[in-house]
Amino acid sequence: MKAVVFAYHDIGCAGINALVAAGYDITAIYTHPDAPSENHFFGSVARTAAEHGIPVYAPNDVNHPLWIDRIKSAQPDVIFSFYYRNLLCDEILNSATVGAFNLHGSLLPHYRGRAPLNWVLVKGETETGVTLHKMVSRADAGAIVAQHRVAIAPEETALTLHHKLTQASSDLLKDILPVIKTGHFPEVEQDHSQASIFGRRTAQDGCIDWHATAQEISNLVRAVTDPWPGAFGYVGGSKFIVWKARALEGLQAAKAGTVLSVSPLVIATGGGALEIMTGQTENGVYMQGSQLAQTLGLVAGAIISSQPVSAIKRRTRVLILGVNGFIGNHLTERLLQDDNFEVYGLDIGSDAISRFIGNSRFHFVEGDISIHSEWIEYHIKKCDVVLPLVAIATPIEYTRNPLRVFELDFEENLKIIRDCVKYQKRIIFPSTSEVYGMCSDKVFDEDHSNLIVGPINKQRWIYSVSKQLLDRVIWAYGEKEGLRFTLFRPFNWMGPRLDNLNAARIGSSRAITQLILNLVEGSPIKLIDGGRQKRCFTDISDGIEALFRIIENKNSNCDGQIINIGNPDNEASIKELAEMLLASFEKHPLRNHFPPFAGFREVESSTYYGKGYQDVEHRKPSIRNAHRLISWTPTVEMEKTIDETLDFFLKTVELTEPQA
């Protein structure tokens, strides 16, 4: 049976050796070059491949068409991935006639994602294992073929557990590989409701929170001890690393981070006390805890912290252009709930953000971005993060005022981008789900889906293309001039303060606001082309939480990334949206103050939007990047969003006497 293998690390070596022992014909092995910054305590897949006389490659992008063609030309029966760090595209997965299999270091569906070895220790688990599963587009979500359980001892470290998992992988593969060879093997679908997903870990994740319990800190130490970078804390401005520690019970309570004794070195935590058994200063040598205390100049009663005293930073200054808009005002509210942020905003109106005026951390100027260029440049220079949210984003304007869309959405925003490059400021740019255009993929993926638009005479694409070109310009500035950026793509965010009913009266609003106006005025709800178009509707609170996490940018996860923000579970046609809205309207307490429902009316898009319009049948996001980079999953159901949006708008209407 011919196999193509993707592998890295010790488990990659174990997988290759198991395949050879089972008599598989490995035609090629794909691996990663060793990173100079990484501690190479593990075996080399490249060396293992060479010892077996198997061709080995380390492409920068294995999903490039050239590599896809090479893999397909090998006509593999099976594909195996053993700790390979990149996802494989569907074309590669589908090239294996029997199937593609991945070996994952946990008992799926638990601990999907990156670094499960470390995460299970951080979380204090007593059992883990390895899982061989079928590979599908969604990471770690395919049917389970085989599992091998591994007990976690109380004093287990990441390295000892790693060795156990490597042996478990060899044992599992020894049993299952001959079965796969027959073409008849078990496939048990995962219970996705039980899935847990974890992101990658970096050295900064070793920072000790002394307010955690002693057992939680001990678990962290075990999870990241040598050869990983280690758990760490600070005495004043000096960093120290903890290599071995244990939780103690029954000691006198004290403020978290307080040194209780120096021989042994014992620190008070948020629950119990922690004995530091071994550690070292940042540039020192490995030593016992009491010597570490002496080296750091510690005495009983001293305070240890989670960050250097000199690094306690000022608030992050966030510049929001278009702060009075739908996203801008909700984002401002979320940022002001966290004392770590200060908001500077510009917009041509202030009705939505008037509730923040007077907050000492909110600074607002009324103005137009096309006029106040000097103010904008000064504040880009002054602030840390820039969000240019000003844009014309209502479909009817794309055909009614295409040049104005281009001038504002592209030209004015390009100036802002260039100022961010000039002053080396981080930009979080609102791309759009519209950039995917008429893409035929079932779900739209930030890194792989094609961006397809219609002919030039369909002017509705001027918004999509303006945004796409800015995405490409920002990406190029990131590659060539070091611009720090994140592109986020909202998928049909809804909620209170989305447009307003006056905008809806002239057709310049999003779908739900237009539908609410029809109900309020007693006019027929117009279903463009029958309302068959499907969209994935996202609650504004879910969207803002994702955007807030992008601004936080823990471990710089979001730098240079594109992130879809949408709710694929809230997919509905525009007609279904209208029907759900009508049901909510009919049961609302204020219903009797409004005219009777006037029915639905189907309208051709060219009649409503003009001859330059063209629509898209579906638009569903992949949110894999959001899961992976910011640990985000939307939670609000569409019915709740509709109820809250309708309630907000009905309460803004000047009520008449109840209808008879």
From Swiss-Prot:
(6R)-10-formyltetrahydrofolate binds at residues 114, 136-140. The active site is at 104 (proton donor), 434 (proton acceptor), 619 (proton donor). UDP-alpha-D-glucuronate binds at residues 393, 398, 432-433, 460, 492, 526-535, 613. Signal peptide: none annotated. Keywords: Antibiotic resistance, Lipid A biosynthesis, Lipid biosynthesis, Lipid metabolism, Lipopolysaccharide biosynthesis, Multifunctional enzyme, NAD, Oxidoreductase, Transferase. Pathway: Nucleotide-sugar biosynthesis; UDP-4-deoxy-4-formamido-beta-L-arabinose biosynthesis; UDP-4-deoxy-4-formamido-beta-L-arabinose from UDP-alpha-D-glucuronate: step 1/3; Nucleotide-sugar biosynthesis; UDP-4-deoxy-4-formamido-beta-L-arabinose biosynthesis; UDP-4-deoxy-4-formamido-beta-L-arabinose from UDP-alpha-D-glucuronate: step 3/3; Bacterial outer membrane biogenesis; lipopolysaccharide biosynthesis. Residues 1-304 are annotated as: Formyltransferase ArnAFT. Gene3D superfamilies: 3.40.50.12230, NAD(P)-binding Rossmann-like Domain. It catalyses: UDP-alpha-D-glucuronate + NAD(+) = UDP-beta-L-threo-pentopyranos-4-ulose + CO2 + NADH; UDP-4-amino-4-deoxy-beta-L-arabinose + (6R)-10-formyltetrahydrofolate = UDP-4-deoxy-4-formamido-beta-L-arabinose + (6S)-5,6,7,8-tetrahydrofolate + H(+). The record marks 140 as: Raises pKa of active site His. The record marks 102 as: Transition state stabilizer. Residues 314-660 are annotated as: Dehydrogenase ArnADH. NAD(+) binds at residues 347, 368-369. GO terms for biological process: lipid A biosynthetic process; lipopolysaccharide biosynthetic process; response to antibiotic. Coiled coil: none annotated. GO terms for molecular function: carboxy-lyase activity; UDP-4-amino-4-deoxy-L-arabinose formyltransferase activity; UDP-glucuronate dehydrogenase activity. Homohexamer, formed by a dimer of trimers. In the N-terminal section; belongs to the Fmt family. UDP-L-Ara4N formyltransferase subfamily. In the C-terminal section; belongs to the NAD(P)-dependent epimerase/dehydratase family. UDP-glucuronic acid decarboxylase subfamily. Bifunctional enzyme that catalyzes the oxidative decarboxylation of UDP-glucuronic acid (UDP-GlcUA) to UDP-4-keto-arabinose (UDP-Ara4O) and the addition of a formyl group to UDP-4-amino-4-deoxy-L-arabinose (UDP-L-Ara4N) to form UDP-L-4-formamido-arabinose (UDP-L-Ara4FN). The modified arabinose is attached to lipid A and is required for resistance to polymyxin and cationic antimicrobial peptides. This is Bifunctional polymyxin resistance protein ArnA. It comes from Enterobacter sp. (strain 638).
